[in-house]
């Protein structure tokens, strides 16, 4: 008979998960950290449809699909640094939907932020305002940039994305940091 305590499966699973998250946080562009965050956002906002960067690229290139309105839900300084071409900016801290007041409520809308959390919440708010075809960009602008997709600013092509801080910046490949 052993006098030591044994870890149960749940404890081991939690420890392994925590170790993987920590490893992910030190990896440039952190695919693991991004995956953990994406899954957490999906769980919290399970009623909101997500669109991957690859799906959005295909959508935008498909002449048979109605064009989506892209909404950037990051602070203005981040939008100014870079965004997806054609996106409109809506302040996530004080959303002013008058920017899209003339957009029919049946228009497909894809909301994005840096990593996905704010965008999913804004997608819920837009649905509450009557937009019935709203989704959010899974992984946000970080996933878009990490996948090599085009970024723009007011002057044309852009090469950097605002990394927020060192912690969130770990989800963004270092070549996109200012």
Predicted regions and their residues:
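Short, polar loop motifs at secondary-structure junctions
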Residues: 73-77
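Rhodanese-like catalytic fold shared by cysteine-dependent sulfurtransferases
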Residues: 2-59, 80-107, 119-178
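Residue-level preference for short coil/turn positions at secondary-structure junctions
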Residues: 64-66, 105-106
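Gly/Ser/Thr-rich loops at beta-strand to alpha-helix junctions
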Residues: 114-118
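Structural scaffold elements adjacent to functional motifs in cytosolic proteins
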Residues: 68-72
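Short, solvent-exposed loop/turn elements at domain surfaces
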Residues: 67, 78-81
């Amino acid at each position: 008979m052993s006098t030591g305590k044994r870890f149960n499966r749940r404890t081991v699973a939690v420890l392994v998960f925590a170790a993987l998250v920590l490893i992910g946080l030190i990896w440039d562009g952190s695919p693991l950290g991004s995956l953990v965050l994406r899954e957490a956002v999906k769980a919290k906002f399970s009623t909101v449809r997500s669109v991957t960067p690859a799906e959005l690229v295909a959508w935008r290139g498909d002449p048979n699909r109605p064009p989506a309105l892209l909404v950037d839900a990051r602070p203005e300084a981040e939008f100014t640094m870079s965004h997806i071409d054609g996106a409109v900016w809506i302040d996530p801290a004080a959303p002013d939907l008058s920017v899209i007041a003339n957009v029919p409520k049946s228009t497909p809308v894809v909301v994005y932020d840096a990593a996905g959390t704010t965008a999913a919440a804004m997608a819920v708010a837009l649905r509450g305002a009557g937009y019935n075809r709203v989704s959010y960009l899974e992984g946000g602008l970080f996933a878009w940039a990490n996948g090599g997709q085009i970024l723009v600013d007011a002057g044309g092509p852009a090469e950097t994305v605002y990394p927020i801080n060192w912690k969130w910046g770990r989800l963004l490949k270092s070549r996109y940091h200012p």
